[in-house]
Swiss-Prot record:
Name under which the protein is recorded: serine-rich chaperone protein 1
Listed Low complexity bias regions: 11-30
Gene: hssl63
Gene Ontology process terms (BP): chaperone-mediated protein folding; positive regulation of proteasomal ubiquitin-dependent protein catabolic process; sorocarp development
PANTHER family assigned to the protein according to its UniProt record, in alphabetical order: HSSA/B-LIKE PROTEIN 1-RELATED-RELATED, HSSA_B-LIKE PROTEIN 1-RELATED
Lineage: Eukaryota, Amoebozoa, Evosea, Eumycetozoa, Dictyostelia
Signal peptide segment: none
Length: 88
């Protein structure tokens, strides 16, 4: 249940300024969706008894959230580098 509640909070983000929200989360969302695909693959391979449906879902959620966080962290680092380069 904890994973599910975490996922729903990710899939329903708080209302923000649309343009800034879409630009800032675009890369993290795409990375998250890539991780969803990987999670499905690994869930199928590594699941007990050939990978049950529940294991696939858990794999997708865990990898999706992980990818979402990784994308956000990467974006923050990239933004920091951009600001650091703008020196007079």
């Amino acid at each position: 249940m904890t994973i599910l509640s975490t996922f729903t909070s990710f899939s329903n983000p708080p209302k923000l300024n649309k343009s800034s929200f879409s630009s800032s989360t675009g890369s993290s969302l795409s990375m998250g969706s890539n991780s969803f695909a990987w999670g499905g693959g690994w869930g199928g391979f590594g699941g007990p008894k050939g990978g049950s449906f529940n294991v696939d879902i858990a794999g997708n959620l865990i990898w999706g959230v992980y990818g979402f966080i990784r994308g956000g962290v990467g974006l923050v680092k990239w933004r920091g580098l951009q600001k650091g380069c703008k020196q007079p």
